[in-house]
Amino acid sequence: MTLSFTARWRDELPATYTALLPTPLKNARLIWYNDELAQQLAIPASLFDATNGAGVWGGETLLPGMSPVAQVYSGHQFGIWAGQLGDGRGILLGEQLLADGSTLDWHLKGAGLTPYSRMGDGRAVLRSTIRESLASEAMHYLGIPTTRALSIVASDTPVQRETQETGAMLMRLAQSHMRFGHFEHFYYRREPEKVQQLADFAIRHYWPQWQDVAEKYALWFEEVAARTGRLIAEWQTVGFSHGVMNTDNMSILGLTIDYGPFGFLDDYDPGFIGNHSDHQGRYRFDNQPSVALWNLQRLAQTLTPFIEIDALNRALDRYQDALLTHYGQRMRQKLGFFTEQKDDNALLNELFSLMAREGSDYTRTFRMLSHTEQQSASSPLRDTFIDRAAFDAWFDRYRARLRTEAVDDALRQQQMQRVNPAIVLRNWLAQRAIDAAEQGDMAELHRLHEVLRQPFTDRDDDYASRPPEWGKRLEVSCSS
């Protein structure tokens, strides 16, 4: 089957990009590719043949139909207007036409200088490229909307960050790379007609059912808000901290995008700050819901020329509804509840308070709870708590709540084990793979990718364990 590409963004939004080619790396080589995703997309195996060099994966060649562009956008960074940003090192190579008529962006990250590189060098480093590939695939297999990773190319090109590293490229796939920042760019340039063109593009290609509806713009923004609410709810339930929720890192389609200083909770700490550059804690774990709303408010402002204020406010209310509804549903599933009762939030908050006091591991606590039998408080989970009396008191209330459900233990445990992962991408696991890869050993990178494809499968090895002491002290930043 021949791959087919289109250039809808280039053809329909001429003011939003600069056309240019990728700049290849020195001695580029393919070190990993997503075989499962490649099969789903009918990508010929010959394209991954190392004897052909880095090929399209390293920006050395283009496939027929590709028309590469770097997109321009702006945004608020850490709550402050940052002005023009754009693809400073990424290039949208083209949009693959799929059998169902939809498209998939092929976006090459680390592809070299663009007009939007500002003071940057247009490169990505191997470390950050590996982290993004692992994180996006981990999120996908957890069932959370996300961009995908198709390939990684390493090289001998030196790249200076805090230390000297080597350049790499990531082929990132997504239904769209349209960001809140695209709309902000033209709003602050006082070009409302281009803001409306972006909205028209989004509706035409992603919500075509609304094209001929009078209230299409209001309906569209409501859906953007709802998708954002559901996405943030998913993040909170698995303990995912994005780390840098600038408006230019927010997807119109409600995808997790731009994995930088992310982290999954180890010890339960609602104030967890994954990004060591976030000195004020703006993007701490428990602030993500309010930051997402703030970002939606910035997007809403750009839409005021063609959506009434009341409609925008209704959409923002929809965000809150979607967030709270989806979060409540997910957390009840994590606790094994099939119905909703008025004291559920109190019971959950009591558990969170106990976990915070004890420094309980977020992922392992819920996974172990999913194996607990309601007839007995004696369990491996109980043994992880120092204050056994406090745990026993909570578990008695939890067990009483379970008895109100007409569901046997086996069915409850099955449900809980489908939503409480045994494995998440802990930073130390990613770092171990990075350390090996930087020495030329890709085995752990491949192995970790395979492990992350089965997050709900119990393991008795270190992939499912608490981090070692050195793994708790890892610092990550926006440097990539």
From Swiss-Prot:
Binding residues annotated for Mg(2+), in chain numbering: N249, D258
Cofactor(s) it depends on: Mg(2+); Mn(2+)
Coiled coil residues, start to end: none
EC number: 2.7.7.-, 2.7.7.108
The organism's place on the tree of life at top rank: Bacteria
Example GO molecular function: magnesium ion binding
Reaction it catalyzes: L-seryl-[protein] + ATP = 3-O-(5'-adenylyl)-L-seryl-[protein] + diphosphate; L-threonyl-[protein] + ATP = 3-O-(5'-adenylyl)-L-threonyl-[protein] + diphosphate; L-tyrosyl-[protein] + ATP = O-(5'-adenylyl)-L-tyrosyl-[protein] + diphosphate; L-histidyl-[protein] + UTP = N(tele)-(5'-uridylyl)-L-histidyl-[protein] + diphosphate
UniProt keyword Ligase, yes or no: no
Annotated active site: D248 (proton acceptor)
Keywords (A to Z) from UniProt: ATP-binding, Magnesium, Manganese, Metal-binding, Nucleotide-binding, Nucleotidyltransferase, Transferase
Transmembrane segments: none
Chain positions recorded as ATP binding sites: G86, G88, R89, K109, D121, G122, R172, R179, D258
Family: Belongs to the SELO family.
Its job: Nucleotidyltransferase involved in the post-translational modification of proteins. It can catalyze the addition of adenosine monophosphate (AMP) or uridine monophosphate (UMP) to a protein, resulting in modifications known as AMPylation and UMPylation.
Name of the protein in its database record: Protein nucleotidyltransferase YdiU
Gene: ydiU
